[in-house]
UniProtKB/Swiss-Prot annotation:
Keywords: Antibiotic, Antimicrobial, Secreted, Signal
Span of the signal peptide: 1-24
Tree of life domain: Eukaryota
Biological role: Highly acidic peptide that may have antibacterial activity.
Protein name, entry field: Peptide BmKa2
GO cellular component terms listed in the entry, alphabetical order: extracellular region
GO biological process: defense response to bacterium
Places the protein is found: Secreted
Disulfide topology: none
Organs and tissues of expression: Expressed by the venom gland.
Length: 74
């Protein structure tokens, strides 16, 4: 029971961190073209400002860009 509670709290923490730090990562679909340019322009200082949830989202974003399913959407 406690492991399920811990997992739920971790997931909620990641989601809350994701939505409250939206300016820290360029994953907004509203500015899709700008987001790709900002991803390319991240430097070391930008990585120090990111939180763990942001790294998860950046990894998901990179995997989506590499996947063939994403290519079919264009």
């Amino acid at each position: 029971m406690s492991s399920k509670t811990l997992l739920v709290l971790l997931l909620v923490g990641v989601l809350v961190s994701t939505f409250f730090t939206a300016d820290a990562y360029p994953a907004s679909m509203d500015n899709y073209d700008d987001a790709l340019e900002e991803l390319d322009n991240l430097d070391l200082d930008d990585y120090f400002d990111l939180e763990p949830a942001d790294f998860v989202l950046l990894d998901m974003w990179a995997n989506m860009l590499e996947s063939s399913d994403f290519d079919d959407m264009e």
